[in-house]
């Protein structure tokens, strides 16, 4: 048993806190490094192993960078609003404010037990009025710039959570929070105009040091399509509608058009005979999520409206159908159907026996089956016959434009961000409604609009704040007459869309942040968190940064320069941890038994950081044995240094061998840690301890050299085992603190050995290993190999046919 324990953890945590070791000074020397882990929801009562995997290894990386001379800023806070706390309150009867404050206190205690160098003086908690005052300020600024607006729209509705969900919060047709099937509902809601930034959000992605998969996910979510907009007139009426298509070359193959069930045009054109069927279909469509409706594998459904459109080129009548695979929120809510050249249209046409008109053939004239979805040569297209797809796109749009029936168009999959929620536990939207003045933003001087405590928040589909007359009834800031407050609250993603800007200036009462300070501190240099936020938080934060830049508050384009996603720690059964499965891992129990550093090192050694894996009790025990072994070997070295006996001052063979391992380890650990490859960095330190152990068994040692080697090793170990290393550093007689020491630098010359080990093979089988001078030429190596006693015995009575020398590695002697 070693001496390392939680008592050592506590001792050094108190010392670090007393001395203000990690207090951040923006004016301190050294290049600024803003390191940020995505902050936690304090909805559960404590940190689990997954939280630790996010925070512990990144803290080690930040410590490593601090020792390299960077001025590291690593704050911590809590994403404290949102459904989890409110649902917990509904279940237990404990008010979300009370449970959140209690949970934050517990999580702060656990995070401090980790021994991380978080800058707690910069903490932010999004549910505090001091924070959400500025979330409301952000809303007002976006409203001023026309980037926040209110409209009635079909929205995603979760019947269980009784609230609206953004598109990004619907996963496979279900609520991401509770897995209930999502339906559609028409509601008047607040939106942020993220689509104004669609082009820049897409174009700047390739400039970021982000995981390729996350970049691809955002690109797909933004979904820029370059195509054409075509206008169709409705037969026997003044009505018309636009469709967006990327294949205008297939226009002459249109045999029907399809409107989304929510398209308002449907009610205007439906015939009396089809009205009941269309209404029934629209009701059914409301029960389907957008993702389900667009599934390629799902059987297509639809209903005829009884109305017809006029083809813009041929003048022919084409039937107008309603189909739920068309979304009102994408493009124009209407599509032209070309079943001969689109798989979805083909399936629909076959099901409802609609015409299928081929207008594209293969370029080489070969026979092709329908649907034929490739580019090719136009046929059955009148004046456009014989043109290639690309030529036809240009010519057809030119003709449509000359007739006032079409134009080139860029379309996006991205929709505006729906930010209002019919729930209690969120930042109130700072708006009042006045019969005289209409929508009136609350003046900045009246912020924050505080969330009342005494509110009935059980969900019933209405905003809980609407039940509080004291909250709702107010006076209009503009005319002074009675007015009503907005009773929806802001999506919690609004709170987290700007929190990284508040950390460096969290005590500012006059503004959300000082632009001069923030422009010096930002962007975040290293951001770490889960990949599940690729199309939500990470996209929203980019939008808010760009909007504030354009308002003149920021001088940078992107919030997070470099992004890393940590992997997932699974339960011992290989399944995702959950209380219901009974496979959760509580860090507290393991820390109590082994200490925080052993727990941290197991997470870093037992798993590749970006991959994760299944928890293993055997793994943490082996790391504990490794730490105990380090302690024993350093104790032996320290005792030898203290006694000063059998000392020598020369650098002989044993010293050179240890020096080689010392600098090899410095190089490897530095390179691996920089790339967040912590498991291989620790493996290198395990290898080194073998070399150090071997050296401490020498009869004579160079004790000054030994102390330097042990000091270097402790500096390498310090970011991974901060409490243990600080203790060992102190016991070695060094001044406080090891984290004020510089990171060791490797000496390339030390990696050049005087002698190298050469394996000698006879007919491909290793017979012996010998040491030779590293500068010995091939002839010399060959001679040394042939002169070796074991090789002489192995080749006796045989003829040497050939000797192959691979310098620095092996000799293969071919005999017969």
Swiss-Prot record:
UniProt motif ('HIGH' region) ranges: 40-51
Keywords: Aminoacyl-tRNA synthetase, ATP-binding, Cytoplasm, Ligase, Nucleotide-binding, Protein biosynthesis
Enzyme Commission identifier(s): 6.1.1.4
Gene name per UniProt: leuS
UniProt-annotated location(s): Cytoplasm
Highest taxon, organism lineage: Bacteria
Any one GO MF annotation of this record: ATP binding
GO term, biological process aspect, one: leucyl-tRNA aminoacylation
Gene3D superfamilies (alphabetical): 3.10.20.590, HUPs, Isoleucyl-tRNA Synthetase, Domain 1
NCBIfam families assigned to the protein according to its UniProt record, in alphabetical order: leuS_bact
Renumbered ranges of motif 'KMSKS' region: 576-580
UniProt keyword Plastid present: no
InterPro entries tied to this protein: aa-tRNA-synth_Ia (IPR002300), Leu-tRNA-ligase (IPR002302), Leu_tRNA-synth_edit (IPR025709), M/V/L/I-tRNA-synth_anticd-bd (IPR013155), Methionyl/Leucyl_tRNA_Synth (IPR015413), Rossmann-like_a/b/a_fold (IPR014729), tRNAsynth_Ia_anticodon-bd (IPR009080), Val/Leu/Ile-tRNA-synth_edit (IPR009008)
Cellular component, GO annotation: cytosol
Catalysed reactions, semicolon-separated: tRNA(Leu) + L-leucine + ATP = L-leucyl-tRNA(Leu) + AMP + diphosphate
Protein name: Leucine--tRNA ligase
Similarity field: Belongs to the class-I aminoacyl-tRNA synthetase family.
Primary location: cytoplasm
Coiled-coil regions listed: none
Annotated residues for binding of ATP: 579
Pfam families attached to this UniProt entry: Anticodon_1, tRNA-synt_1, tRNA-synt_1_2, tRNA-synt_1g
């Amino acid at each position: 048993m070693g001496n390392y324990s939680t008592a050592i953890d506590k001792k050094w945590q108190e010392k670090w806190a007393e001395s203000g070791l990690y207090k951040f000074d923006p004016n301190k020397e050294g290049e600024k490094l803003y390191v940020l882990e995505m902050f936690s929801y304090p909805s559960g009562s404590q940190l689990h192993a997954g939280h630790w995997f996010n925070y512990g290894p990144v803290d080690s990386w930040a410590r490593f960078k601090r020792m390299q001379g960077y001025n590291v800023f690593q704050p911590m806070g809590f994403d404290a609003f949102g459904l989890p706390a409110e649902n917990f309150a509904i279940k237990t009867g404990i008010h979300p404010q009370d449970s959140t404050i209690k949970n934050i206190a517990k999580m702060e205690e656990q995070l401090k037990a980790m021994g991380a160098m978080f800058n707690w003086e910069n903490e932010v908690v999004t549910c505090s009025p001091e924070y959400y005052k500025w979330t409301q300020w952000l809303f007002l600024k976006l409203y001023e710039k026309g980037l926040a607006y209110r409209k009635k729209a079909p929205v995603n509705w979760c019947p269980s959570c009784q609230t609206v969900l953004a598109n990004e919060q619907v996963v496979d047709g279900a609520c991401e929070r509770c897995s209930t099937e999502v339906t559609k509902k028409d509601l008047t809601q607040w939106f942020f105009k993220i689509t104004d930034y669609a082009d820049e959000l897409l174009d700047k992605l390739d400039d970021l040091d982000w995981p390729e998969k996350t970049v691809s996910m955002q690109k797909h979510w933004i979904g820029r399509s370059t195509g054409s907009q075509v206008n169709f007139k409705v037969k026997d009426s003044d009505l018309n509608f636009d469709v967006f298509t990327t294949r205008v070359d297939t226009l002459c193959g249109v045999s029907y058009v399809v409107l989304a069930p929510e398209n308002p045009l449907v009610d205007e054109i439906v015939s009396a005979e089809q009205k009941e069927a269309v209404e029934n279909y629209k009701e059914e469509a409301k029960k389907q999520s957008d993702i389900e409706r667009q599934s390629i594998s799902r059987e297509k459904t639809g209903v005829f409206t009884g109305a017809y459109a006029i083809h813009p080129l041929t003048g022919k009548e084409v039937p107008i159908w309603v189909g739920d695979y068309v979304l009102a929120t994408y493009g124009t809510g209407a599509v032209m159907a070309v079943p001969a050249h689109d798989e979805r249209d083909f399936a629909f046409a076959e099901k409802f026996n609609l015409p299928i008109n081929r207008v594209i053939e293969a370029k080489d004239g070969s026979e092709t089956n329908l649907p034929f979805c490739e580019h090719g040569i136009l046929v059955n297209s009148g004046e456009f016959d014989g043109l290639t797809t690309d030529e036809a796109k240009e010519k057809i749009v030119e003709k449509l434009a000359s007739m006032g029936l079409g134009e080139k168009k860029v379309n996006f999959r991205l929709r505006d961000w729906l930010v209002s929620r019919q729930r209690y536990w969120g930042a109130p939207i700072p708006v009042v409604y006045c019969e005289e003045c209409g929508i009136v933003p609350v003046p900045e001087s009246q912020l924050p609009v505080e969330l009342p405590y005494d509110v009935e928040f059980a969900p019933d589909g209405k905003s809980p704040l609407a039940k509080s007359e004291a909250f709702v009834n107010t006076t209009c800031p503009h005319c002074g007459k009675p007015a009503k407050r907005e009773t929806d609250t802001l999506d919690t993603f609004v709170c987290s869309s700007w929190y990284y800007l508040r950390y460096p200036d969290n005590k500012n009462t006059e503004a959300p942040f000082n632009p001069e300070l923030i422009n010096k501190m930002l962007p975040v240099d290293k951001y770490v968190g889960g990949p599940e936020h690729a199309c939500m938080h990470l996209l929203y934060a980019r939008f808010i940064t760009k909007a504030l830049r354009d308002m003149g508050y920021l001088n940078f384009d992107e919030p997070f320069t470099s992004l890393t996603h940590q992997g997932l720690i699974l339960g011992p059964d290989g399944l995702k941890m959950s209380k219901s499965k009974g496979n959760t891992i509580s860090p507290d129990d393991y820390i109590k038994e082994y200490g925080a550093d052993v727990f941290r090192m197991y997470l870093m050694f037992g798993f590749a950081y970006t991959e994760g894996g299944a928890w293993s009790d055997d793994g943490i025990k082996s790391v504990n044995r490794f730490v105990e072994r380090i302690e024993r070997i350093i104790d032996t070295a320290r005792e030898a240094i203290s006694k000063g006996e059998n000392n020598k001052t020369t650098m002989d063979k044993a010293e050179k061998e240890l020096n080689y391992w010392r600098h090899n380890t410095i190089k490897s650990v530095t390179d691996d840690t920089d790339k967040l490859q912590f498991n291989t960095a620790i493996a290198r330190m395990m290898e080194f301890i073998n070399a150090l152990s071997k050296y401490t068994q020498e009869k004579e040692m160079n004790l000054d050299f030994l102390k330097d080697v042990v000091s270097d090793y402790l500096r390498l170990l310090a970011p991974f085992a901060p409490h243990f290393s600080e203790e060992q550093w102190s016991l070695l007689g060094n001044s406080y603190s090891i984290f004020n020491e510089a990171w060791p630098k490797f000496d390339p010359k030390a990696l050049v050995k005087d002698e190298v080990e050469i394996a000698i093979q006879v007919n491909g089988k290793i017979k012996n290993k010998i040491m030779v001078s590293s500068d010995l030429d091939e002839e010399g190596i060959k001679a040394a190999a042939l002169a070796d006693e074991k090789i002489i015995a192995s080749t006796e009575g045989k003829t040497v046919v050939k000797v192959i020398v691979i310098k620095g590695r092996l000799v293969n002697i071919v005999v017969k």
